[in-house]
């Protein structure tokens, strides 16, 4: 399914002439984070999809000037399409949405996840539990794209994940920012991994 979705996306995006970074095929030779390009994840939440859990999506982001400026996420389980970016307020199936305005962790829902390369050593786990314990609720849905889309829609208050791939997060970052939220991330060219904090401006500020 992921390869079929990628083929369909490439058929649409190739005519634009912009280089592409995709989870499945990797990066075009000309793709660079300091140039315009597309970043796509044909199927985010693959394990959920394989196991029949209706929490997966397709993510497409337009990257410009070192930042995602447009995001589109097709939510498979609910047949919802999220769109948003610079000059385009975030919407879900055409209805405008906004980030939540939670100002303190004690009243907020955090959505997060553990990447496959997560450090499960004592020090890392202790710091992670300290961070998670601040929040009223914590949700791990196994799909970064939807976690960010749901944060943009106010269903979650903050998304934070370390060492996440750009193709998992780029579209969602654009959605959060276009919904009035803030996002911080520092991508590394050639590695395509970053740590993302996105959602309520007050909560993002509190994490830094």
Give the label of every model feature segment.
Residues 1-43:
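N-terminal subdomain of lithium-sensitive/metallo-dependent phosphomonoesterases centered on the IMPase/IPPase/PAP
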Residues 60-148, 194-208:
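Acidic beta-strand-loop-alpha-helix segment within the catalytic core
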Residues 34-77:
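Glycine-rich active-site/cofactor-binding loop and its immediate structural neighborhood
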Residues 126-130, 146-208:
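Oxyanion/phosphate-interacting regions
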Residues 49-52, 140-141, 164:
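Short glycine/threonine-rich catalytic loop with a Thr-x-Gly-x-Asp
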């Amino acid at each position: 399914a992921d390869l079929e979705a990628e083929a369909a996306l490439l058929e649409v995006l190739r005519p634009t002439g912009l280089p592409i970074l995709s989870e499945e095929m990797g990066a075009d030779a000309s793709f660079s984070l300091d140039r315009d390009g597309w970043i796509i994840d044909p199927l985010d939440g693959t394990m959920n999809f394989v196991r029949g859990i209706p929490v997966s999506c397709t993510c497409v982001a337009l990257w410009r000037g070192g930042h995602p400026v447009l995001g589109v996420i097709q939510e498979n389980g609910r047949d919802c399409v999220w769109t948003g970016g610079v000059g385009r307020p975030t919407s879900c199936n055409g209805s405008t949405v906004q980030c939540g305005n939670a100002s303190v962790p004690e009243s907020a829902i955090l959505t997060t996840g553990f990447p496959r390369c997560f450090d499960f050593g004592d020090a890392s786990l202790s710091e992670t539990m300290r961070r998670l314990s601040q929040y009223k609720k914590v949700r791990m849905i196994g799909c970064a794209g939807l976690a960010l889309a749901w944060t943009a829609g106010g269903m979650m208050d903050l998304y934070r994940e370390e060492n996440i791939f750009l193709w998992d997060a780029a579209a969602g970052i654009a959605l959060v920012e276009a919904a009035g939220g803030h996002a911080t991330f520092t991508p590394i060219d050639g590695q395509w991994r970053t740590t993302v904090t996105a959602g309520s401006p007050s909560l993002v500020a509190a994490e830094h």
